[in-house]
A protein has these predicted regions:
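Pyridoxal 5′-phosphate
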Residues: 1-193
């Protein structure tokens, strides 16, 4: 099982890990070789865990940040976090549809309700370059989004959003409806709706 630390676990970018049985670990070859600090007198990668798969200087600030993120998740209800995020997502979808019920100016990617959704809403703005919209949201309204293909060009081909990609909004439990309203107002002004 391989995982990234910066998505659902809420840790810093550049963190992650994997769980593997001892038997499988002995069969696997490391992808990267180099010093580990534990067996410095040889150029060979150690055979023991975790050093076998951890070349170079460990990302201690990242590991500490991931640890703190896991402690946060341990002390907060995952169900409550999920409910808050989905509530915000539903609200944002409603506001987008109220802003442009024709879908001519804003194309919502995926279902327009919470069925099979997580706390992410991707849109396209067919009449205005999406990079420009994302730039204006950030620089004029302080609304951070992600624009483009999101490291997943094949997913965008499947969705019919390739090669332009989308503008992606994602919500966390710290976000508020007021912040979402601010993003909607920014879109309204930028798209001249």
């Amino acid at each position: 099982l391989a995982f990234t630390g910066h998505k659902g676990l809420r840790g810093p970018q550049g963190t992650g890990g994997f769980l593997v049985s001892q038997e499988l670990a002995e069969q696997m070859e490391p992808l990267i070789s180099g010093g580990t600090g534990s067996v410095s007198h040889t150029e060979e990668i150690p055979n023991f865990m975790p050093d076998r798969f951890e070349s170079g200087t460990p990302n201690l600030p990242g590991i500490y940040g991931l640890h703190e993120a896991l402690l946060y998740l341990k002390t907060h209800s995952l169900q409550a976090i999920n409910e808050k995020e989905l509530s915000l997502t539903g609200y944002f979808l409603e506001q987008l549809q109220a802003l442009d019920d024709t879908g001519r100016h804003i194309r919502i990617i995926g279902k327009k309700d919470l069925t099979d959704r997580n706390a992410v809403v991707s849109i396209q703005t067919p009449e205005i370059d999406m990079s420009q919209v994302a730039w204006q949201l950030d620089n004029e309204y302080g609304v951070m989004t992600r624009v483009g293909l999101h490291c997943a060009p094949n997913a965008h081909k499947t969705l019919g959003t390739y090669p332009a990609g989308t503008i992606r909004f994602s919500f966390g439990p710290e976000n508020t409806k007021n912040e979402l309203d601010f993003a909607i107002q920014g879109l309204k002004k930028i798209l001249d709706l």
